[in-house]
Swiss-Prot record:
Recorded name of the encoding gene: atpE
Molecular function as annotated in GO: ATP binding; proton-transporting ATP synthase activity, rotational mechanism; proton-transporting ATPase activity, rotational mechanism
Domain of life: Bacteria
Physiological role: Produces ATP from ADP in the presence of a proton gradient across the membrane.
Protein name: V-type ATP synthase subunit E
Lineage of origin: Bacteria, Fusobacteriati, Fusobacteriota, Fusobacteriia, Fusobacteriales
Family indicated by similarity: Belongs to the V-ATPase E subunit family.
One GO location term (cellular component): proton-transporting two-sector ATPase complex, catalytic domain
Keywords tagged on the record: ATP synthesis, Hydrogen ion transport, Ion transport, Transport
SUPFAM superfamilies per the UniProt record, alphabetical: V-type ATPase subunit E-like (SSF160527)
Gene Ontology biological process: proton motive force-driven plasma membrane ATP synthesis
InterPro entries (alphabetical): ATPase_V1_Esu
Amino acid sequence: MSSLDNLVAEILQQAEKEANRILVKVKAENLEFTENENKKIQKEIENIQWKTNEEAISLKERIISNANLKSRDMVLQAKEELVDKVLKMTLERLKNLDSDSYLDFVENALKTLNISKNAEIILTKKMKDVLGKEIFGYKVSDDIVESGCNIKDGNVIYNNEFSSLLEFNKEDLEREILKKIFG
């Protein structure tokens, strides 16, 4: 499974570079946004000179707070886009696993299940062509999946497609990705 570890490390390294690029961009946008908001604040103060000093200060604080909220939202959106990009890259890499890593994945999936010897393994077209009609003592199904594998035992299908696994674990993966990239 070391190739999967290398794959994860490479993806995280690329994601970190992308995160840094996005953060620099967002910081520049935030600075410009804050400068524009400060100009708006100054105009508002000049327009309401007849109001008391407390009202002007209160308005300034609300505008700054609003700018900070918008800034925070921009950063959150950039992080969300980064996570989506990392997950998309991960899915593409998983779809292109070499046959040894793919077999390791299928074997691990089989180890976690209590299935009968009559179960069938549903593979990707590419791996079905490479691996043949039987693996690990189980028949390879005529059906195919887009990525990963499914295991059919009677009327029960165990979904181990990579896209489904990533979606199922998305919240945990998001936390882990953001933790690895941003500390």
